[in-house]
């Protein structure tokens, strides 16, 4: 931790300005300068984690290799940095309060009255410092907007850290909005000025202003922001919209963001090696080929619910020089008459709950019968089993006990116990609490030889991430396999991890979530081969 330098990223004016992408972009540039870099996300909500939150409320829940259910921004961090992060890279107010209360119950505060300062702020600082061990730089993204009640004590902790570590160890980057008023054809800086004033009132002074704007800012406007916000002129970085989020590091580099960072930290001029990154971004922006994927989901009103999967398709497309277009198909309305003209492949993602299930099953049946490349992920694989049992084996009562605990043929069921990542036995029932009771994180999968899975991964054993409670019931395996649906992946205790259908161009189901390990520089192999198959169809 002694050598670590900290870059705190806050947001002002309004939410959803792209602090996560901004943090990822800064980290990427520093990483390509051969520094050890990581990112920490602070979420100011009181939930322990987002695991039980609705996807429509929070967006995607991203699962780390060590089984933490985290904010979707952790997914961005991993994809930009091309490395695994852990539960240390995300914490919430709920976790902070729980730790402080637990310590108080243990008597660790020696009978003191527990207060926001110093006890809560000390716990925040402890976690930040812990995440910085062994690093040259830790970028810390503070969720929410400056002025929110929920974020006050985080800003106080940042103020204290700067005092403890010294100016040469801390930079504050403030992401703000420069709105464009169409009627007067003007860009307005006043919201940024007021946001910085509020931030300074709380004891935190930014050294870099990252101005989100729909249009470039001229020198006069940049100088105005610099003067009113008390920063150097070259410390006003304009972040206009880009055609791809992966172009943001290049934009920031062109804007000169590394100059004030190097100056503040007393570093030599920074020269990131971005040639390979630039090549992939060019293929995203100007691809040679196109392919259309039918994405059958139920959380379509908030597509960030499927963020990692959307990005994984982009990664695969970049490596195949193809633009992957998504045809969003609402599972609640999908039926045998749904128009699939121009759709090159069908993707059924993971999910929870009974809503939209029959539409997904119908989509799987059509992919099977119409020889469309198909990839089913988690629930998507489970429903592929249900569809096959109903329509090929004739087991009309086949279902998952998630939707009908008394179904005639429980081909997907809740197993009472399983071994977790630490080889500890876990017990779960239909009445178990929802939070933290799933099979979470990275587990090993043994791959059968001569399968599509082996062809994709090119090795006999892989590790992929999971997030589910229900498993495929092996009782009916012999019947499926006699009709051509083969089990090609096994986990611990012979849990079924992957299936493939014979005599089909590409029909694969996986219990794990391959999207969680896909990166721009290294797309997930099974998703890559899925897109390859779709391209051969287009």
Curated annotation (Swiss-Prot):
Keywords: ATP-binding, Glutamine amidotransferase, Ligase, Magnesium, Metal-binding, Nucleotide-binding, Pyrimidine biosynthesis. ATP binds at residues 16-21, 73. GO terms for molecular function: ATP binding; CTP synthase activity; glutaminase activity; identical protein binding; metal ion binding. It catalyses: UTP + L-glutamine + ATP + H2O = CTP + L-glutamate + ADP + phosphate + 2 H(+); L-glutamine + H2O = L-glutamate + NH4(+); UTP + NH4(+) + ATP = CTP + ADP + phosphate + 2 H(+). Pathway: Pyrimidine metabolism; CTP biosynthesis via de novo pathway; CTP from UDP: step 2/2. UTP binds at residues 15, 188-193, 224. Its EC number is 6.3.4.2. The active site is at 378 (nucleophile), 513, 515. Allosterically activated by GTP, when glutamine is the substrate; GTP has no effect on the reaction when ammonia is the substrate. The allosteric effector GTP functions by stabilizing the protein conformation that binds the tetrahedral intermediate(s) formed during glutamine hydrolysis. Inhibited by the product CTP, via allosteric rather than competitive inhibition. Residues 1-267 are annotated as: Amidoligase domain. L-glutamine binds at residues 351, 379-382, 402, 469. It is an enzyme of class 6 (ligase). Mg(2+) binds at residues 73, 141. PANTHER family: CTP SYNTHASE, CTP SYNTHASE-RELATED. Homotetramer. This is CTP synthase. It comes from Helicobacter pylori (strain HPAG1).
